[in-house]
Amino acid sequence: MIGQITSGLFGGHDDSKKVKGTVVMMNKNVLDFTDLAGSLTGKIFDVLGQKVSFQLISSVQGDPTNGLQGKHSNPAYLENSLFTLTPLTAGSETAFGVTFDWNEEFGVPGAFIIKNMHINEFFLKSLTLEDVPNHGKVHFVCNSWVYPSLNYKSDRIFFANQPYLPSETPELLRKYRENELLTLRGDGTGKREAWDRIYDYDIYNDLGNPDQGKENVRTTLGGSAEYPYPRRGRTGRPPTRTDPKSESRIPLILSLDIYVPRDERFGHLKMSDFLTYALKSIVQFILPELHALFDGTPNEFDSFEDVLRLYEGGIKLPQGPLFKALTAAIPLEMIRELLRTDGEGILRFPTPLVIKDSKTAWRTDEEFAREMLAGVNPVIISRLQEFPPKSKLDPEAYGNQNSTITAEHIEDKLDGLTVDEAMNNNKLFILNHHDVIIPYLRRINTTITKAYASRTLLFLQDNGSLKPLAIELSFPHPDGDQFGVTSKVYTPSDQGVESSIWQLAKAYVAVNDVGVHQLISHWLNTHAVIEPFVIATNRQLSVLHPIHKLLYPHFRDTMNINASARQLLVNAGGVLESTVFQSKFAMEMSAVVYKDWVFPDQALPADLVKRGVAVEDSSSPHGVRLLIEDYPYAVDGLEIWSAIKSWVTDYCSFYYGSDEEILKDNELQAWWKELREVGHGDKKNEPWWPEMETPQELIDSCTTIIWIASALHAAVNFGQYPYAGYLPNRPTVSRRFMPEPGTPEYEELKRNPDKAFLKTITAQLQTLLGVSLVEILSRHTTDEIYLGQRESPEWTKDKEPLAAFDRFGKKLTDIEKQIIQRNGDNILTNRSGPVNAPYTLLFPTSEGGLTGKGIPNSVSI
């Protein structure tokens, strides 16, 4: 029967022609961290002969025996390798020839089926048919792991790079399109295996490990009104023994094996795998080494010179058995990254940007304030719109939480203005870390942490810089939450012990800001909220769908890095809990904040207006006018935002010309419905969700998704080491309360203020762990793909979108030039500040490494 069908397909022998193609593949071991050294020898693929077959699928000639699906060509097999490519990774790609039988009736191939009869998987990059008669070149972008066929329940199929809306799909390809989506959705059951490609949702019930005792129990996030959360990728691991509602965890040594759909572990030597390996090494090997190093010695820095030795001299690690185990366990390629050593076991860190030019400028009030506009967390500051500041916490539960700052505290610093005049002139701003922290502060302070909730008021000076006016530090009333808070207000001083107290007050604010930054600005508002978009896009939008092609680069590695984070970073006892002041309450606290998350407000212009730092203004270039003109994050960000929106507008307008076309796109409607009702299901009834009924709603939504995944993440991630790599500037923990007069701590503060400061903030061991973490998080991989770039230049066949994408890239290049110009303008004092650190976090491109610039396409580290 099969012989008759293929004979009918290709006709007599005289009619058949040959179509030659090129297949690009990558060997499994190239990307295997456990055998990195061995893999670099680059063995030739053992895939020749009849071990890998390809069958083209016609988009114009049907197969009557196969339910109106396109006919298959005869199988074709890989021929001898043509050449070896050497990309930036340590491995290599190999190109093979493949020759297909073809005839006129077969027409244009729209897809192909691949079968792997080999024992190992391989990474398939692409298939290119160079000269299909009467059509020319046909290119298939694959970028997928192909396992032995026995591992799959259905054929592996890949489509040509011609996008189609569902209604425009060639009839003979529709069933293939639909079946591929069914495969990717799975049926919601079973434990996922390494070769699976299934995308599904789950709640965050895998952060704790109740089988290891009560101290390792963590609140389930998601699925409840009390602790709502974005969904994560489902792994299907069995429940824990002691709590059937908690998912079991995999052992630390298997951290690289945590499930994500196989193609979310891309075919490149990616930073997220490096991060996972590095974090595992820190937890498993470096921490015991550091404990051994500090055992029997005080876990304190005695002076700022002590701290500087981390960067200028290094710390000699003991040459004990654990150190030998460390060097034996980590591939040689990574030793220099984890331990910058000259072979003598010296733990040394690069000098962070914040102390590169001056060792003391970070302590100035101007720099303290400037980093709220141009530091690593420039997304919190807001305009003060009522005085004194009022709390939004429920007074029934928390009593009076309103601020105790009075006009007397600040009016002598307002350049002759009253408080009302300063507010009316848009001169007063606030960094408000009160309401988010107070509900947890009583519990947080039962740990080694001794922290406050803080409010910081600032004044916008005529030169465009901000001046701190007052810091209010509050902690829960000792008699109970219903009695409100105990607060004290501190004001700037540069004389005597009051100056030291003011420096400590700023440090308590920085501790708050670091914790809010890591858990909310960074983890929640980029990593966590984007994962449901990754899952829904793969489940509901075919790879043929134009919107899949638009968004796909902005999801690269996100599920992988988030899975690694659940395993090593944000889990019970993980690195983040060990470094931030919220400790074991950190993730639960982020769930409470998620209650206020609003998707349309993630658009940069909307965010700036909501925080009161901008007002809507149709005459301004981006539709908003900044009230702080020299606001580097906002100025550069609005340029990037507008470039993204122009690109998305051009792209979407090519495919959708009317509301009707949006409404009849069944894949698009299913995608948006699933995002609302499942991916962000705890917020499905919110009135602010776009209805997805117009091209403009699609444009706005896609622009916001791309902004979150690219520029917003870059702004809050890659400045971590430049600003927080020097822990005194951004301490993660406070261990003592503010010294009171008459106490030994107060006398120490008068006698040795630097030592008292260092005894208050992050301890020595935590500092080393924290600096190690932010250094890893702040690095770019050498094969990073930045905004305005694509992995494959042939990602679509449509010429108009390709031209629009080219315009997008050129616009980003222009923005780079503008950023350089602004950074060179001495009038814009907030661009570099007292520390002389030019603002480059939204500079679109970068080299690999620790650069403090570059906008990767996706949340990939």
Curated annotation (Swiss-Prot):
GO terms for molecular function: linoleate 9S-lipoxygenase activity; metal ion binding; oxidoreductase activity, acting on single donors with incorporation of molecular oxygen, incorporation of two atoms of oxygen. It comes from the Eukaryota. Binds 1 Fe cation per subunit. Iron is tightly bound. Gene3D superfamilies: 3.10.450.60, Lipoxygenase-1, Domain 2, Lipoxygenase-1, Domain 3, Lipoxygenase-1, Domain 5, PLAT/LH2 domain. Residues 163-861 form the Lipoxygenase domain. Keywords: Cytoplasm, Dioxygenase, Fatty acid biosynthesis, Fatty acid metabolism, Iron, Lipid biosynthesis, Lipid metabolism, Metal-binding, Oxidoreductase, Oxylipin biosynthesis. Residues 220-246 are annotated as: Disordered. Fe cation binds at residues 522, 527, 713, 717, 861. GO terms for biological process: fatty acid biosynthetic process; lipid oxidation; oxylipin biosynthetic process. Residues 29-160 form the PLAT domain. Its cofactor is Fe cation. It catalyses: (9Z,12Z)-octadecadienoate + O2 = (9S)-hydroperoxy-(10E,12Z)-octadecadienoate. Its main location: cytoplasm. It holds the Pfam family PLAT. It is found in: Cytoplasm. Monomer. Belongs to the lipoxygenase family. This is Linoleate 9S-lipoxygenase 1. It comes from Solanum tuberosum (Potato).
